[in-house]
Amino acid sequence: MKLLLLLAILGAAAAAEQTPWSPWRWWPFSSSDSAAAEPHWNTLKVGWGINPLTSFQSLPRTRSEAVKQGWTMYGRTTCAGTYWQGLRMIYQDDPAVILLFDRNGFIAGMQMGVKQSDLPADRSIPARDVIPPWVQDRNNDMWLITTYFIRPDTICTVGRTATEFQAKGTGADLYLQTGASPRTDFVIIPKYEKDLEGTDWTPGKCFWTMGKHYFKNLRENMRCEELYPLFPLYNEGKLNAFGLLIGASVPSPTSRYESPIASKTFYQLFMTPVPKCLQSHTEEKGMTTLHVFLENDPRLNNFC
């Protein structure tokens, strides 16, 4: 915990400075117009932290790699489903990360799953305010938030070729499923930070190794149950990471999750404004986040 606080202090320096900076941006061989280039998502990692054994964990991006690494099929064995698209795979029965592969075996998206038994008994979480994008998986008695990296309506129809996977990597866009029909109920998270201007995405703080945070319709006097479960992260003006959250303390057998500190000072490193309810909510019910990184070496490159 002390190390986490130390790193948080370092992040505060970046938050206070709010200056786009990276130690590699002054490297003489770096591209001068990298900020204008399209994001290239060349990896898929989850988990933020200071422990190298449990943070920035690389995930397989092909079904064959997943099988080699011990991932197993989860639920139905067909690609197209009623409430999501893709062949689902899970590692050691931990629903914190459920990978979705297209019909050809290439990464197509991922889900964060939370078992009902791990949530408050009064069923207050997730709240109606965020249902959807939280969608109930009644077959497994859990709640899911689903993101896709390619168009959902292509995942189980044509999928991607090996050439397309090599060219685009993890994907080209970030889609958030916002209803029960995965092929039609989704929004696309803006790929460029400039496209958030004039929207209800509230700019937050820059935190080194993560990026510039944005939170949907964040307000000081909001109810914490309204906290939107996805927050995008931008570096050099481009989307290259995002986070998922739920307002409860939930376990992850494979150590995927992060547990924010119940402190306004801590939340000020990421949010502006900080909702008044957040410290007490975290003390009473907890808070769980999952960071997802789409480009290599976030420790070195994600400096906003």
Predicted regions mapped to residue ranges:
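Primary mode marks residue(s) on the alpha4-beta5-alpha5 output face of response regulator receiver
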Residues: 17-304
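Cleavable N-terminal signal peptides of Sec/SRP-targeted secreted and luminal proteins
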Residues: 1-16
